[in-house]
Amino acid sequence: MVITTGTALIKPGQVATEEDSADSDSHPRLRAEDAAKAFAARGVRTSIVRPGASVHGEGDHGFVPVLIDIARDKGVSAYIGDGSNRWPAVHRLDAAHLYRLALQDAPAGAVFHAIADGGIPTREIAEVIGRHLELPVVSIAPQDATDHFGWMGMFFAIDAPASSALTQERLGWRPAHLGLIDDLELGHYFAPEARTVTV
């Protein structure tokens, strides 16, 4: 069994590794890791995969399409503060490969990071979105983030760099597909038919 959580809440502001424990008191979703470890202790071959803030690629219905829709609706592509906070990301095909390896080869209780881009400054994400939508790129003050981004403001403000070095060493997994910025540059995120997210 493979449990999915995420890297964003593991160690905000510092590079999260596979050896960092989730503080399940800080967010209910992280309690899934406690459950996975309990199953592993009972002999169930359970592992944990932690993707980053963006699992990207064609058909993405995650946070990046939400940011694009917010930019379209607001008429600007924004980042928060100086935009130096970092988002980790992985291409969906690389993530799928990691899940397969985890199912096949992971020892009970193992933790893996589905991370290719260890930490992309959110300003870079906003700049690519602004360029493709031909919109100004602006900074939003942290106290105004919720007014501008709605529920997404909390997530876009997180500084959550992460590493997958131990995952690559232990499973032989190597990200082979485009990083998030290069994937955005292809343009498929900005096609009219790609707008499927309600802000």
Spans of model-derived segments:
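Amphipathic terminal alpha-helices
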Residues: 178-199
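Conserved C-terminal active-site "lid" loop/helix of NAD(P)H-dependent oxidoreductases
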Residues: 127, 147-174, 190
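A conserved pocket-lining segment of Rossmann-fold NAD(P)-dependent short-chain dehydrogenase/reductase
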Residues: 69-90
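Conserved beta-loop-beta element that borders a ligand/cofactor-binding pocket
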Residues: 34-58
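Mid/C-terminal beta-alpha module of Rossmann-like enzyme folds, strongest
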Residues: 98-152, 197-199
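Conserved Rossmann-fold NAD(P)-dependent oxidoreductase catalytic core, especially the SDR/UDP-sugar
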Residues: 1-27
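A conserved structural motif in NAD(P)-dependent oxidoreductases
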Residues: 88-95, 106
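Glycine/proline-rich active-site loop of Rossmann-fold NAD(P)-dependent oxidoreductases
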Residues: 30, 55-66, 73, 101-112, ...
